[in-house]
Amino acid sequence: MTQMQTIIDGSHRTAKSKARDVYRHPIETLSFFGVSKNSSVVEITPGRGWYTEILAPLLKDKGSLVTVIYDANLTKVPYLQKLNKLYKNKLANDKKTYGRVKILEIAHMKPDFKTKKSVDFVLTFRNVHNWAKSGTIDKMFDSFYKSLSTGGVLGVVEHRANAGTSLEQQIKSGYMTENYVKQIAKSAGFRFVSSSEINANPLDRKNHRNGVWTLLPNQRGLSEPEKELYRKIGESDRMTLKFIKN
């Protein structure tokens, strides 16, 4: 059994977290980006820490992990304030797993940052639509570029819209086009390297009345019978893109 598989099977992860592995393919995704136990990694806006559960133990002995979250004092959004507290508590309550994780707090609407030391990887999972909606996406990608070493990798996983979808509809639905993400990354100075279909889901038709949030894990606005139908689809169809800082 590989180290990463041992971590994924670990008792520090809840059954709820493990149930999402089948949709998120963490071993394949991190391997595609090139992350190893020796890597220095920045994880951007990790939410409740699903990927932190895997990255922190993987990197704690020979690598390093910085997670970038929104400063609760610099946002007026209650959800983000709550998320800040939940995430910090998660890390504080399990020092064995998360004791070496460093947290960098940034302003929600002015996310201009640079890590103290340049890193090998910047990773972001299912976040691009949020930055497009808030109008902060250019600043975020510029900050990624500043934080990476030359030759460093930006790894992006995001809900994938059909090609040609308008930006307005992308923001409304939570699904972004690959072309949009590639253009944003290119404008920040990144070179696109490759893509993977690891996180593709052909069952997702992307025409749900509540956008991507209709699907697991949110299932927003669904009746119980509808939830059962949508569980058969699984989580969203996702792009997995790899960029390099020249």
Go through each PLM region and give its residues:
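Class I SAM-dependent methyltransferase Rossmann-like catalytic core
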Residues: 3-37
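Conserved class I S-adenosyl-L-methionine
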Residues: 37-47
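A short glycine-rich, Lys/Arg-flanked "PGG" loop and its adjoining helix->strand segment in the class I
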Residues: 56-57, 137-150
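S-adenosyl-L-methionine
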Residues: 79-111
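A short acidic, Gly/Pro-enriched loop at the edge of an enzyme's catalytic core
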Residues: 98, 112-122
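A short, conserved alpha-helix within the catalytic core of class I
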Residues: 105-109, 130-143
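Core SAM-dependent methyltransferase catalytic element
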Residues: 205-246
